[in-house]
Curated annotation (Swiss-Prot):
Gene name, Swiss-Prot/TrEMBL: psbH
Protein name per its UniProtKB record: Photosystem II reaction center protein H
Gene Ontology BP annotations: photosynthesis; protein stabilization
Protein family per UniProt: Belongs to the PsbH family.
Annotated Polar residues bias: 1-12
Top-level taxon of origin: Eukaryota
Modified how: Phosphorylation is a light-dependent reaction catalyzed by a membrane-bound kinase; phosphorylation occurs on Thr residue(s) in the N-terminus of the protein.
GO molecular function terms attached to this record: phosphate ion binding
Region (Disordered): 1-20
Subunit structure: PSII is composed of 1 copy each of membrane proteins PsbA, PsbB, PsbC, PsbD, PsbE, PsbF, PsbH, PsbI, PsbJ, PsbK, PsbL, PsbM, PsbT, PsbX, PsbY, PsbZ, Psb30/Ycf12, at least 3 peripheral proteins of the oxygen-evolving complex and a large number of cofactors. It forms dimeric complexes.
């Protein structure tokens, strides 16, 4: 037999901690899906703005052709 139970063991289940008690409400919504699109449009806008930001940083770093008409000093 792979597992063995000991009768009369004093194991009472999972141990409660302060951190666990603080984080428990955050996990109570696990698996629930909001109806409709939810915050998807906001996430799309955030991703687009981040992509624009990254392309600007890359263009500045590479001294890209797109920035030839813009003086940086």
């Amino acid at each position: 037999m792979a597992t063995q139970t000991v009768e009369g063991s004093s194991r009472s289940g999972p141990r409660r901690t302060l951190t666990g008690d603080l984080l428990k409400p955050l996990n109570s919504e696990y698996g629930k899906v909001a109806p409709g699109w939810g915050t998807t449009p906001f996430m799309g806008v955030a991703m687009a703005l981040f992509a624009i930001f990254l392309s600007i940083i890359l263009e500045i770093y590479n001294s890209s052709v797109l920035l030839d008409g813009i003086s940086t000093s």
